[in-house]
């Protein structure tokens, strides 16, 4: 069958709906699109090279899981006909990678897809690419340094430097990055003098998108996290590690030695977005069991994103997991920065879209002698 249009007949596609739904046309027409995905490949290759040079072993863990663990998120559910049981598309590989530490592998990483049954936005796609890395006898501090090393190397590979421009604004990705405890950030950047002692009227004013019942259901850690998300996160343009997370929202992280109410945990924020999450890993099976039990209580109270009980993982910890540090780094959001992409759909070759009202079809039929390019009918905006 003859091609509908030749490569050189295109001079760009203005309709973003067609760009995302028919990426092959976008790649044919748009040099910038091809360059962006070449940059992505260069950056991902650099990521793997740096980790392997540091002695990390690349592994693969299950996509179909009996328990959707390792993160607070709503999973996709599928059914295994032969076994007559429901399974979950993984929301994170964390608990399997930690089992490998129990088994004796001291440095492991995986770059692969995670799946979360949540909304679509310029920053969210239901399936996305994530790096997770774990190192025995390391801690959260080591994972901060690893994060800086990886981002610095990937930026050099894709952009030939660490000082870039994102959406018309300067952005310096040169390590080391600033650090700021979460509570301090809420006080200093959020302008909330005493976030631990707020009345209902204050919370209603500061968290207007939550109902009275939702505000009442928040524990102290969730309340601080909600205040941070509403009043601090959008302001974090330059890279900053937010540290000292409340233990209530960190069920897989080790407690800080000098303050057991806090987790030895960090998240990296750039341009108002979370890019990385890491911590010193909890390896006490009794503490982990109690954390899972607390999360199960939260689920029974209506929190659909709370962690599930995973007794098999607790059993693995009872066999002995060494102290360790772990890191999760979102590849798509990082590639957005390196390619100056406004939407996550610009860095995923075939992003998920809302269904069109009718099947795509040629508007005028195949290209004729004039060389007119094939154009699909446009459905509703995603």
Predicted regions and their residues:
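Class II aminoacyl-tRNA synthetase catalytic cores and aaRS-like
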Residues: 1-382
